[in-house]
Amino acid sequence: MPKQSEKISDSNKKNIAIDEKFSIGDIEILPFSIPHDAANPCGYTLFSDNKKISIATDIGHMNNNIIKNIDGSEFILLESNYDPEVLKCTKYPFKLKSRIAGPTGHLSNQVAGQTIN
């Protein structure tokens, strides 16, 4: 049986704010807003030793704010999780298909590829 996770101590918790940098060790982290159907979703850009890495998951659509924040990154992690044509053919209910492909749902594989290029 898996061991139950221990409670995270309050000293190891930190509230973060969109567009306000914070640090963990020598890594500066900048949270940036992303469109998704959740409370205050964000992506992150990490800076250390003159290097820049960006991470953004659960993106409903690509926008100028995301592009601005990931621009110049040496490594970009974007989540994309559907092909529009395959999604159309699934047995998912219309409401779920609409949520996935909607402006606050998820990024298609095609849009993620176009963004990286």
Where are these regions (language model features)?
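Core dinuclear metal-dependent hydrolase active-site scaffold
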Residues: 17-75
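Active-site HxH/HxHxD metal-binding segment of metal-dependent hydrolases
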Residues: 1-21
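Cap/insert and terminal regions of metallo-dependent hydrolase folds
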Residues: 64-117
